[in-house]
Amino acid sequence: HKIFYTGDINLSSQTLQPSAHLPEIKIDTLILESTYGATDSDLLLDWNSESLRFAKEANNILNNGGSILIPVFSLGKMQEILATIWLLMQKRKLTTVDIYTGGLGTKINRAYDYNRFTVRRVDEEFELSSIPQKDYYEISNPEEFFKHPCIVLASSGMMITSTSSFTFAKRWLKQKDSAIFTVGYMAEDTPGYVIANSERGDKIQLTSFDEPTEVNCAIKNFKFSAHARREDLVKIVDKLKPDNVILTHGDEEAFDWMGSSILKKYKNIKVQTAAIEKEIKIL
């Protein structure tokens, strides 16, 4: 009995990571992520189009003397966004400014470079270490970030309490010429979600322990996703034609869309949804 578990999967290439290759063998059970099962694909730009939208918004901030904070996950999103920013600068699509990185993300950058010939890459010759970067841990006074325009990539991606991005965000929120750009998913119970769903002039409270603060900076949200669109998820079923599909990593609405779409095309496929502590029988 052969099981294929997609994990987070994307059939489109990012800056570093190429599109996923699917197995050529017969699959009996497919465990399929459903992250964007409830999202209209017309709302999702491809990576290149979203990069150009990012560059346009970033130039508006940088060319007016502001700095940009981008909260990122240390693994994956940090490397993809860093490479995207650098290539936009090289193509003169994005104003060239200092890029600050630090912490675990920079260590993972080295792992990416070291293993670039042993895993699939869009360009295996490209090294993240070739990108000029400054270490934000070497900045003793955060006000240094606002003396000259710059871009800061800091974890955690959801601006969790006590992380670098959370600490920096408190400073950024006070800066009328600067901006916080979100580039990925924010869980509802995180400071990142509060910030991503606010706009200039709002009063927000990041945690129950923090005083309400006014949003003075710009807030811009981008979808640089490592997840496939829902139509592409169905295409995975089309290609593999499994006997069983187990839907994971999605909410009820996502499961409903995915399940009904699969069953409309394939009456003989058994579709189930995963849940914590739920036992699923496949044999």
Model-derived regions: residue spans:
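Proline-aspartate-enriched helix->loop->beta-strand connector
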Residues: 237, 241-247
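A short, acidic, amphipathic alpha-helical segment used as a generic capping/interface helix at domain edges
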Residues: 163-168, 172, 225-239
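His/Asp/Glu-rich metal-coordinating catalytic cores
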Residues: 1-80, 84-93, 98
